[in-house]
Amino acid sequence: MVAFAASSGGFNASLLLNITDLLLAGISTSAAAFIDESYKVSPLANYFFVIPSAIVLALLITAVTELFINDKARELVNHDHVDDDAASFTTPDHIETPDDEGLKLAAEEIRGLKVTGLFILGMLAAYFALLFIPGSPFLGPDNAAMESVLITDIGAVIGVMFFAAGLVYGLVTRSITSGGDVPRFMAKGLETLVPMMVLFFAVSQFLAYFEWSNLGQWTAIKGSEALTAIDMPTPLLFALFVLLVAAINLLITSGSAQWALMAPVVVPMFMLVGIAPEVTQMLYRIGDSPANIVTPMSPYFALALMFLQKYYRKAGLGTLMSLSLPYAVTMMVGWFLFFLAWYYTGLPLGPGTPMEYPAG
């Protein structure tokens, strides 16, 4: 359960920049264009807040585990009589299976990982050197590091770094022996991205029709007028939005797909009442992650149930839900309160990230 909760919370609170940051930033930029075509949301827009968030979530998960889940687990399972062989994910020594060898790393694979790890560290050192050394050709106007192309176009940087790392690993392990092997591996890697490419084709059409019909602007204007008339306190508005995201996430488990549906409405609407897109995006992430572990629609929910049944064969959806819910509620409430403290302190969510947008 700890691993399940941590992977859910870590989905939107990673210490390292990942594909989620790139996808959400791209969608937010497209949505902000309904109000300001020149507005651009950086993939690093939430990075300053996300790093301490990972620590806060780790502490919250630890607290829930120690104060509640451990006692609940002892009620469900007598740990003095657990069949370790049946519950483990490894096969006992006296049973041989053809898949065992596939789970073990060969000597050349271990060496490849070590060499690639060192290579990545070298690339990171070079990246930060080019970013911060005075006189670097990659610095932005007035030698501003945060306006460097290495920051604004970090998606390309990540792509190049992973391509180079994969190439090094392939050469060290000799899984790449000729130039013809590279396109083959690239094609194989793209297989996992095809569903995402199809999704974003549909999303791009949706956004284009939304802009063509002016429905996005109309919805944003009417929504902002309603919010202004209600004069709702900002913390309450934030809380209701987070709860809305969590509720929708019970049905749409793909973070990027859900944001693609919500962003064209909420981002322009919040901009018109003075809330920057980066703030709206972070609120979305707070509502999205914790809800992932309580929706049966998620494939990981079924996977977690299978793992749970190895220890407690009577476990069903209700059992997993009762164990997941304390984590989800605690993470959502604790993370949201941490965000409010950060927001009202005036600290930026990321490098060069505004907290407000000129209303109107």
Question: What residues fall within each predicted segment?
Answer:
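Membrane-core helix-loop-helix motifs of multi-pass transport proteins
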Residues: 1-77, 283-285, 301-341, 347, ...
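Hydrophobic, small-residue-rich membrane helices and short re-entrant helix-turn-helix hairpins
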Residues: 98-114, 139-145, 171-193, 314-322
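Hydrophobic core segments of alpha-helical transmembrane domains in multi-pass membrane transport
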Residues: 6-14, 49-67, 117-132, 157-170, ...
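Intrinsically disordered, low-complexity non-transmembrane regions of multi-pass membrane transporters
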Residues: 69-111, 355-360
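Short helix-coil transition sites and intra-membrane helix breaks within transmembrane domains
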Residues: 15-19, 174-176, 208-217, 248-261, ...
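Interfacial loop-to-helix junctions that mark the boundaries of transmembrane helices
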Residues: 40-52, 107-114, 141-158, 228-232, ...
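Core transmembrane alpha-helical segments of multi-pass membrane transporters/permeases
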Residues: 147-217
